[in-house]
Amino acid sequence: MRLVGSQYKDMEDRLSPSARLVRSPGSQTRIHSIESILGFKGETLFHPAFPYGSGKTGKDTEHLSPKKDSNKHFDGVCRSTVMVSPDLPDADGGKLSDDENPKKKHRRNRTTFTTFQLHELERAFEKSHYPDVYSREELALKVNLPEVRVQVWFQNRRAKWRRQEKLEVSSIKLQESSMLSIPRSGPLSLGSGLPLEPWLTGPISTSSSPLQSLPSFITPQQAVPASYTPPQFLSSSTLNHSLPHIGAVCPPYQCSGFMDKFSLQEADPRNTSIASLRMKAKEHIQSIGKTW
């Protein structure tokens, strides 16, 4: 149903929570609102301490006061529980010293060895890298150090020795690898890959001058001495077509002053064996010639 005009407006004023007291000069009008129906008084409704529409009466404020007291009590309990332990140091007191704190690890000062002590320790290390207890105690008395310090020194010295050994081995390996990696250049090489000198790779011929293929530091005059006579089996008719006469090719050998004093046969200790071999070869050739 729809209300029209003043009736609709009057109903809105009655049901509105923001209805106000309408005062006339002579009398006070009756308030028709939810607050008046529920029994709220105008003094409590429009009291300046409470905002309009809060809906809190004096009884509600009385119920709120114990909550504030309980909150204060709760804060006191929390503060009492969160207390600094008497065993812990005060924040303003600073940190404990090393003597007062037994849990802190005691750091030992670094031992400084003298030259005499280092010399004796190195001598003992050269004798044995792992000395026994008696040797360490004797050495400790000698160098005026505790036995524990001597033991620790030997441990550190062995570690240093191992590092040096590893470095030496690695340096040797590096040198070997660098030497293998260097390419060797040569004019000519065989199938095996080994380089050859130029005089070794010269042509080999059976011409009338076979001494031309000799190395450059050996002259033809120094190649064959004049007093040298080849075996008779080399001058046989079977080898005349392949080997020329050496005496005709080579000029007389010019011996030095030392060779003038001592002949070649006297200087050669194998002259007797060579002579015997020549005789055997001669007899063998003669025996072969008789059969033919």
UniProtKB/Swiss-Prot annotation:
GO cellular component: nucleus
Sequence motif Nuclear localization signal, location on chain: 278-282
Motif, Octapeptide motif: chain positions: 32-39
DNA bind region: 106-165
Residue ranges with Basic and acidic residues bias: 57-72, 92-102
Family matches, as PROSITE patterns: HOMEOBOX_1, HOMEOBOX_2, OAR
Pfam families: Homeodomain, OAR
One GO-annotated biological process of the protein: eye development
InterPro entries associated with the record: HD, Homeobox_CS, Homeodomain-like_sf, OAR_dom, RAX/RAX2
Extent of motif OAR: 272-285
Region (Disordered): 1-27, 53-72, 85-107
Main location: nucleus
Gene Ontology molecular function: DNA-binding transcription factor activity, RNA polymerase II-specific; RNA polymerase II cis-regulatory region sequence-specific DNA binding
Subcellular location: Nucleus
The keyword Ion transport is assigned to this record: no
Keywords (A to Z) from UniProt: Developmental protein, DNA-binding, Homeobox, Nucleus, Transcription, Transcription regulation
Family to which this protein belongs: Belongs to the paired homeobox family. Bicoid subfamily.
Annotated function: Plays a critical role in eye formation by regulating the initial specification of retinal cells and/or their subsequent proliferation.
Name used for this protein in its record: Retinal homeobox protein Rx3
Lineage of the organism: Eukaryota, Metazoa, Chordata, Craniata, Vertebrata
